[in-house]
Amino acid sequence: MVYVLDTNIFRKLLDHFPKKGKAFEAVWKALDEGIANKTIVSVDECYNEMANHYSPDSENLKWIKCRKEMFLNPTNDESLILKELFKKTKMQESIHTKNILNNRPSADAYLVAKAKTLNATLVTSEIYKPHSAQLPNICEELNVNYISYDDFMEILSSQS
């Protein structure tokens, strides 16, 4: 199984998940193994979101930069998915006006398109809200499976 990680998953891991202790280190090792064998990926827009979020000299940004190869660019197939997705007015709401005005990255649609083309499961902390353009709603629109941070941590823990 391939997992596509949302920015909020990286931020939870990097900002809150301990780096020391046998059980914690095993989870970090499982994460790095998944990144190395390409079963854990993300998109370049997530990388850009985190580069904007963390200070240039932070340990978290250094960790991300050391794993830059996991942040994939969109393919032609994904671009076609995005084109069709954004024909729907409700889905256009997934890109917030403030992101457009401030030239800030917005990864949600790219994440779902990546998961769709890889037949992967998207991992996010966002919760489904009816009539919304949250990540779970975009997943529903494109018939993409998604799981929570807790579900993903359980999977990583079982691999360690």
Where in this protein do the model-derived segments appear?
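Short, well-structured N-terminal submotif of metal-dependent ribonuclease cores
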Residues: 1-42, 51-64
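PIN-domain endoribonuclease scaffold, especially VapC-family toxins
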Residues: 47-101
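Short His-Asn-centered micro-motif
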Residues: 5, 43-44, 123-126
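Acidic, PIN/NYN-like endoribonuclease modules and their adjacent C-terminal/linker elements
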Residues: 2, 121, 127-160
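Acidic, metal-coordinating catalytic cores used for nucleic-acid/nucleotide bond scission
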Residues: 49-54, 104, 126-131
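Acidic, metal-associated active-site segment
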Residues: 102-122, 134, 138
